[in-house]
């Protein structure tokens, strides 16, 4: 596996975002838990890897050699061609710690019986995505959470306004089914950050009787890699679940930061408001917490700032 990039330098950390829906036994999972933790410690990797009977989902950050070592170990237990991988770069470590966890699901929808490794929608490559979503007969759905959609989306996409992926099935039954019946679109197209949520969402829709269901292979991050900004249909930045908070179309850290009180992404304008106190409150949560909470948040922020100066 060649993970080198002629635009990178030794000063940058490599970030690998990956997933695979593949059937694993408990023996395989136990071996991977041991081996991945050892590799993370050996190479000083940071990030999170989730393992389940349905596959693997993770984002890790570290040196090129360290990231390569962990990915090669994973791929030894994967079927070739079923490993979705995106690489980006950051000048600072994107995570604070390294975790490998055994989970019931690698992306939690909360439903038993779904098997994306067997039943899944039609993959659409990034270079074909514009033609698909430009078609007025395509119903475009964002499968991410509401706070992610708030800072960037494909133009014309439906926002289910979910707080977590567990909410998606209820939205399908309460709103999407009647929407499809009324609009009779030729097809449904879905997308997410890296491809894993929209892939599982297509499996769910097909199980529930929906037809002509498509999803963006590799998600928004793959689209950023392969589609030029001049041709892009993307508006805004893409939220990511690490210290970078958001990425722009060049896959570089964007302008958003995170409110460590409520977890909402904040624009530069949000950060200039009188209601904003770093780590304590923002416009989204100014009336949400008690004075006791704010005292605790302020102390946590002080400790974080002290740690970052070391």
From Swiss-Prot:
Residues 134-232 form the Rhodanese domain. Its EC number is 1.14.-.-. PROSITE patterns: RHODANESE_3 (PS50206). GO terms for biological process: tRNA modification. It catalyses: uridine(34) in tRNA + AH2 + O2 = 5-hydroxyuridine(34) in tRNA + A + H2O. GO terms for molecular function: oxidoreductase activity, acting on paired donors, with incorporation or reduction of molecular oxygen. CDD domains: RHOD_YceA. InterPro entries: Rhodanese-like_dom, Rhodanese-like_dom_sf, TrhO, TRHO_N. The active site is at residue 192. It holds the Pfam family Rhodanese. Keywords: Oxidoreductase, tRNA processing. It comes from the Bacteria. It is an enzyme of class 1 (oxidoreductase). Belongs to the TrhO family. Catalyzes oxygen-dependent 5-hydroxyuridine (ho5U) modification at position 34 in tRNAs. HAMAP family: TrhO. This is tRNA uridine(34) hydroxylase. The lineage of its organism: Bacteria, Bacillati, Cyanobacteriota, Cyanophyceae, Synechococcales.
């Amino acid at each position: 596996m060649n993970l080198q990039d002629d635009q990178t330098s030794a000063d940058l950390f490599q970030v690998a975002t990956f997933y695979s829906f593949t059937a694993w036994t408990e023996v395989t999972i136990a071996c991977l838990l041991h081996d991945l933790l050892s590799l993370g410690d050996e190479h000083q990797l940071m990030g999170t890897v989730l393992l389940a009977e349905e596959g693997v989902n993770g984002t890790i950050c570290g040196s090129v050699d360290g990231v390569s070592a962990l990915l090669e170990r994973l791929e030894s237990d994967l079927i070739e061609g079923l490993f979705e991988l995106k690489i980006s770069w950051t000048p600072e470590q994107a995570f604070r710690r390294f975790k490998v966890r055994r989970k019931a699901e690698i992306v939690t929808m909360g439903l038993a019986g779904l098997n994306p490794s067997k039943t899944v929608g039609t993959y659409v490559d990034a270079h074909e995505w514009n033609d698909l979503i430009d078609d007025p007969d395509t119903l475009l759905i964002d499968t991410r959470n509401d706070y992610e959609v708030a800072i960037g989306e494909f133009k014309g996409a439906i926002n289910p306004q979910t707080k977590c992926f567990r909410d998606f099935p209820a939205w399908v039954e309460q709103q999407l089914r009647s929407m499809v019946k009324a609009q009779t679109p030729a097809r449904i197209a879905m997308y997410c950050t890296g491809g894993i949520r929209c892939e599982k969402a297509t499996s769910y829709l097909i199980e529930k009787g929906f037809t002509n269901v498509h999803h963006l292979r590799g998600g928004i991050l793959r689209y950023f890699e392969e589609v030029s900004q001049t041709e892009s249909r993307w508006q805004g930045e893409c939220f990511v679940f690490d210290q970078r908070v958001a990425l722009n179309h060049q896959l570089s850290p964007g302008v958003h930061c995170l409110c460590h009180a409520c977890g909402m992404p904040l624009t530069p304008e949000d950060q200039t408001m009188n209601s904003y106190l770093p780590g304590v409150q923002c416009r989204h949560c100014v009336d949400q917490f008690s004075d006791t909470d704010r005292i605790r948040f302020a102390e946590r922020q002080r400790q974080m700032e002290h740690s970052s100066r070391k």
